[in-house]
Amino acid sequence: MITTLYKEPASFAHEFSNINLLWASLFIEELVRNGISDFCIAPGSRSTPLTLAADQHTEAHTHVHFDERGLGFLALGLSLFSHKPVVIITTSGTAVANLYPAVIEAKLSAIPLIILSADRPVELIDCGANQAIDQYRIFSHYPVFFAQIPSATTHIKPNYLLTTINQGLQQQRQTPAAIHFNIAFSEPLYPQTATLNYQGYLQSLKQWLIDKQPFSQYFQNKDSFQAASNTQLRDKKVLVIAGRVTGINQAQAIAEFAALNNYPLLADLQSALTGNANNLHYYDLLLVNKQFTENLQQADIIVQFGGKLISKRLSQFIEGFAGEYLLVDPGNTRIDPAHSLRKRFVCSATQWIKSLQNKIPDIDKHWSQVLQQQNNYITKQIISPFLDNNLISEISVISALDKLLPADNPVFIGNSMPVRLSDMFFRQNAALPFSNRGASGIDGLLATASGIAKSCASITTLLIGDTSFLHDLNSLALLKQLQGPFVIIVFNNDGGAIFNLLPVPTQQKQDYYQLPHGLTFADSCRQFSIDYYQPESLDQFVGDYQKSLQNRLSLIEICVKNDQTYNHLEYIKEQIKYATF
């Protein structure tokens, strides 16, 4: 027997018997906000929070059937006729497996189904617990999106659920088929008499609770770009962030957009815009200063182009930002580690900027000017005086390279300390920056830089840490294939100096994190016929680098104490933190 139930509309509550019921209600609410109205439900205990949430939602039409296999095909029929996604809710165990035939048909017929399968919590899997099977990706490649949702907890922001739902729906819009959310529910599953007030927990959804729109909205065509963009940006203080951007024309479009509208720009190293006049070059360091941060928080909206930001402080700023936050990026992957993104434009920077058509009216140039003045102040009063000596250090070498790197030639910057310092201290760099910031690993960096050098046949510079270099030492064999010049700059701080910046236990720091090796790389260079330099002053480094630009293969080893960079950064941050502008 199949039963269909209809109800009348109400607003989202703050009080629930337990967090399972809250999370389930968030799930159903966000699906309804995305225009989904049909919910097919099979009976089961573990799926109780989802069943009750669907039943209690006034805009959810529920269809009930005792057999999951038939329920799956019922959902297919509903979707076939309505041309809308249909939700299927099941309990755990073989109940989920019975949906497999419908999931296959959905894939082959391009029919959008949304599976919400309840699961046992992780501690009850593979231990003999009742009705507990491995449901992780149970439908193999047939769904176009899968998410394993952990057991509900107040330690995970509710935003995570909403952004995950919307990412799945976005994938489904592009490739209609099933999407699968496997949701672990710990007990209690049922309502109790007493309720808890979750208003504080839901604070990060304040605007979502008011506006009745999906938390994350995706825009993909020109009309929607123009309507959304012009409405949002008009008469607003806009902060532009440039993340990883592909192509010089994209970077130039972002720079012109910021300059034309007097918007402050925070340019990540990967954007190739660090030398732009509008860029607040030292924003990462300035974010330790309360006055600067408060000024930056006056922004009404953040427009971010590209993702994978290097600066942790900037990512934290975005996470705590109270205004509107939108992202422009042509890729399909989610770029939202803070789970705070409300609007995502799936297009290139040039497409999005062109869709604005006209110059947005100027507003409050003073705000942008104050931010630039604060950036200029620390440049003149703190950074420049600190660098005004001949001391060789990781920071001084990067600051020197900022002026020395050949324009329009590639520089590959290794992960860990080199990329962070480069992001902090490059100011006018006109080289083409590259890095492996997808997974941010420290392996294969020399080999990647070699590939770039083979492709471009121009001067290539590699900036790499000693531990990363040790990881990829055998890739020196690749260099014999290069025409050159190829310049390797190794920061040798005798192990993982990056861990000085992290709160690792002091007692175990050397033996389990930094692993000092006591090695230098002169002999490695002899073995592979590479010119070797080890400068002892900044002036020597400048001379050695300029000579290396005339050689085929060169390695410049910068040997510094393990704690030098940590001490220098702490000094600089302390000066900036207490600066008054």
Curated annotation (Swiss-Prot):
Keywords: Magnesium, Manganese, Menaquinone biosynthesis, Metal-binding, Thiamine pyrophosphate, Transferase. Its cofactor is Mg(2+); Mn(2+); thiamine diphosphate. GO terms for biological process: menaquinone biosynthetic process. Its EC number is 2.2.1.9. Pathway: Quinol/quinone metabolism; 1,4-dihydroxy-2-naphthoate biosynthesis; 1,4-dihydroxy-2-naphthoate from chorismate: step 2/7; Quinol/quinone metabolism; menaquinone biosynthesis. SUPFAM superfamilies: DHS-like NAD/FAD-binding domain, Thiamin diphosphate-binding fold (THDP-binding). Binds 1 thiamine pyrophosphate per subunit. It is an enzyme of class 2 (transferase). It catalyses: isochorismate + 2-oxoglutarate + H(+) = 5-enolpyruvoyl-6-hydroxy-2-succinyl-cyclohex-3-ene-1-carboxylate + CO2. InterPro entries: DHS-like_NAD/FAD-binding_dom, MenaQ_synth_MenD, MenD_middle, THDP-binding, Thiamin_PyroP_enz_TPP-bd_dom, TPP_enzyme_TPP-bd. One of its GO terms (molecular function) is thiamine pyrophosphate binding. Belongs to the TPP enzyme family. MenD subfamily. Catalyzes the thiamine diphosphate-dependent decarboxylation of 2-oxoglutarate and the subsequent addition of the resulting succinic semialdehyde-thiamine pyrophosphate anion to isochorismate to yield 2-succinyl-5-enolpyruvyl-6-hydroxy-3-cyclohexene-1-carboxylate (SEPHCHC). Homodimer. PANTHER family: 2-SUCCINYL-5-ENOLPYRUVYL-6-HYDROXY-3-CYCLOHEXENE-1-CARBOXYLATE SYNTHASE, PROTEIN PHYLLO, CHLOROPLASTIC. NCBIfam families: menD. This is 2-succinyl-5-enolpyruvyl-6-hydroxy-3-cyclohexene-1-carboxylate synthase. It comes from Psychromonas ingrahamii (strain DSM 17664 / CCUG 51855 / 37). The lineage of its organism: Bacteria, Pseudomonadati, Pseudomonadota, Gammaproteobacteria, Alteromonadales. The gene is menD.
